[in-house]
């Protein structure tokens, strides 16, 4: 009887050396995001972070999210350096809605076979997103799971914790009839609606490399999600923000009501902005109804802010100084009976 060949973890499809190489590659990206509250170094069993001393009654705010099927496009077109920004953006933009300053972020990267170069590119993007939002990348998990994912396909998840002064939590309770609505421009579809995007590409048989407003369509589709944290923290400090809505999955119809009292509605002027070309392209090539567009995509509005009408001019000036494209998009009004909470005129 012959002696069986000794087996290793690598024979089973898990390369520990590749994982160690990845950790080495991303140290610079992690270091760049470090905040003074972070204790210890990368690689511990748990990551430690103090609460900033400026907070008197700190409340922690947490969120978790992914990038969805935008990853499929990124993998197919080998564009891995910006999906990490998407991942961070989807989490930190949810936190800022409640007035929270992001403190730290952790990521989960799962794949069938770890490609160190690809994973390094992805995590460097996560580091860039954390840098843009002033958030520390303090840990994460890389899971190589042969048999669970096809080849080098991968999936991402992110988890973020922020902090807000208890008295300064923004929860929509101050929203009142007559409040103005300011829109902040998106950079594209962000990270929502990509199953429909991919279906439009399939049905229309469109060439993703075709020109759209001076650059390939695929670049419009893979444009990273805009991070609004730093500009909105400044707006919150300088103005009287009553509510904010991050326009993600569910579009206008689902996200805006989340921050409105039941007796109020948002009345939006549909002609107050022009949709970016990528949304018009999707609508035309997918024969998508306008209602469905507003239900699925942000249609050029990544964030909505409600504040007193007399604060609009100062808010728009501040946002412009921070590099944001913003405009007055509508107002809050009383809602009667079973009226919809969002009207687009």
From Swiss-Prot:
Q: What does it catalyze?
A: 2-formamido-N(1)-(5-O-phospho-beta-D-ribosyl)acetamidine + ATP = 5-amino-1-(5-phospho-beta-D-ribosyl)imidazole + ADP + phosphate + H(+)
* BP GO annotations: 'de novo' IMP biosynthetic process; adenine biosynthetic process
SUPFAM superfamilies in the record = PurM C-terminal domain-like, PurM N-terminal domain-like
- Alphabetical keyword list: ATP-binding, Cytoplasm, Ligase, Nucleotide-binding, Purine biosynthesis
Q: Which HAMAP family match?
A: AIRS (MF_00741)
Q: Which PANTHER family match?
A: TRIFUNCTIONAL PURINE BIOSYNTHETIC PROTEIN ADENOSINE-3, TRIFUNCTIONAL PURINE BIOSYNTHETIC PROTEIN ADENOSINE-3-RELATED
Record-given protein name:
Phosphoribosylformylglycinamidine cyclo-ligase
Q: Which gene encodes it?
A: purM
């Amino acid at each position: 009887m012959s002696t069986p060949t000794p087996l290793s973890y690598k024979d089973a499809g898990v390369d520990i050396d590749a994982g160690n190489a990845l950790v080495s590659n991303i140290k610079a990206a992690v270091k760049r995001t470090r905040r003074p509250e972070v204790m210890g170094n990368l690689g511990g069993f748990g990551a430690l972070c103090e609460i900033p001393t400026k907070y008197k009654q700190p409340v922690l705010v947490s969120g978790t999210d992914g990038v969805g099927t935008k990853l499929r496009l990124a993998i197919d077109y080998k564009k891995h350096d910006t999906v990490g920004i998407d991942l961070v953006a989807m989490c930190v933009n949810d936190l800022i809605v409640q007035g929270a300053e992001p403190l730290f972020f952790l990521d989960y990267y799962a794949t069938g076979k770890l490609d160190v170069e690809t994973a390094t590119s992805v995590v460097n993007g996560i580091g860039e997103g954390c840098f843009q939002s002033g958030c520390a990348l303090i840990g994460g998990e890389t899971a190589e799971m042969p048999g669970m994912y096809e080849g080098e396909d991968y999936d991402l998840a992110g988890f973020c914790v922020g902090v807000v002064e208890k008295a300064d939590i923004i929860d929509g309770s101050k929203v009142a009839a007559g409040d103005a609505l300011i829109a902040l421009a998106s950079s594209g579809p962000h990270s929502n609606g990509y199953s429909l995007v991919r279906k439009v590409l399939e049905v229309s048989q469109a060439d993703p490399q075709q020109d759209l407003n001076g650059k390939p369509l695929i670049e419009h589709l893979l444009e990273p999600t805009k991070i609004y944290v730093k500009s909105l923290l400044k707006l919150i400090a300088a103005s009287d923000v009553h509510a904010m809505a991050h326009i993600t999955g569910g579009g206008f119809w689902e996200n805006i009501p989340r921050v409105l009292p039941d007796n109020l509605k948002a009345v939006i002027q549909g002609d107050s902005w022009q949709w970016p070309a990528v949304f018009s392209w999707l609508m035309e090539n997918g024969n998508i109804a306008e209602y469905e567009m507003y239900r699925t995509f942000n249609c050029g509005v990544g964030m909505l802010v409600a504040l007193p009408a007399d604060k609009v001019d100062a808010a728009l000036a501040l946002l412009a100084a921070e590099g944001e494209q913003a405009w007055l998009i509508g107002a809050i009004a009383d809602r009667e009976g079973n009226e919809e909470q969002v009207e687009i005129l």
